[in-house]
Amino acid sequence: MMASAPQDRPAGTPPQGRGLLIVVTGASGVGKGTLRERWLAGQDVFYSTSWTTREPRPGEVNGRDYVFVSPAEFLAKAQQNGFLEHAQFVGNHYGTPIEPIEAALERGQDVVLEIEVEGAMQVKDRMGEQAILVFIMPPSLTELRRRLTGRATETPERIEKRLTRARDEIQAAHDFRYVIVNDNLDRAVSELLAVQQAERAAQKAAEHWTPEEQQARALADTVRSTALSREALQQVVES
């Protein structure tokens, strides 16, 4: 059972000394992987490698991008309650092993998950407000279609399935704490760094924040999902 937060710290933030659990999610093709690599470069964070039953894409490395397993191996792990979350997406299974995540959080190391939206919501249900959900959004569905087509790894039918699912996910963007539009990589990286620094600062009283932490909080507030209008989301799915 999680300890309650001290009164000088916002409810739901992890205890001081415990790592942050940052969950990055979004539609396939939105650029999560590239963004995550730039954001975490040089950082001492624990990046959780998901298990999956899908086939590796060209250039993917087992154990770095995913742990590629058979359906039987995946099912056995799930039956042992070995996943923090797991979900099926476009015919393949994805899951996040729980043991290494808890160990990293306990030693004060920030943990980053890059997972599907369904899995992200499972993490939120299980971890509550300690799970910092960041939704990466495309500037438009037209741009997302272009990126998916350009990868040349999906059939037209699967691309249409991904776009249909992406439309639903974008319209539910207010379910996440933060929403970052990935139309400019440098800006998106800066916003992710600000979110991380602001959430770390939230573990202590605001009067103890440094000027850099105050600046990070101000930038992070601009990408809170509450700052995004329904009209803006509708514009993304219709463009």
Curated annotation (Swiss-Prot):
SMART domains: GuKc. Residues 19-197 form the Guanylate kinase-like domain. Its EC number is 2.7.4.8. It catalyses: GMP + ATP = GDP + ADP. InterPro entries: GK/Ca_channel_bsu, Guanylate_kin-like_dom, Guanylate_kinase, Guanylate_kinase_CS, P-loop_NTPase. ATP binds at residues 26-33. Signal peptide: none annotated. GO terms for molecular function: ATP binding; guanylate kinase activity. GO terms for cellular component: cytosol. Keywords: ATP-binding, Cytoplasm, Kinase, Nucleotide-binding, Transferase. It is found in: Cytoplasm. Belongs to the guanylate kinase family. Essential for recycling GMP and indirectly, cGMP. HAMAP family: Guanylate_kinase. This is Guanylate kinase. The lineage of its organism: Bacteria, Thermotogati, Deinococcota, Deinococci, Deinococcales. The gene is gmk.
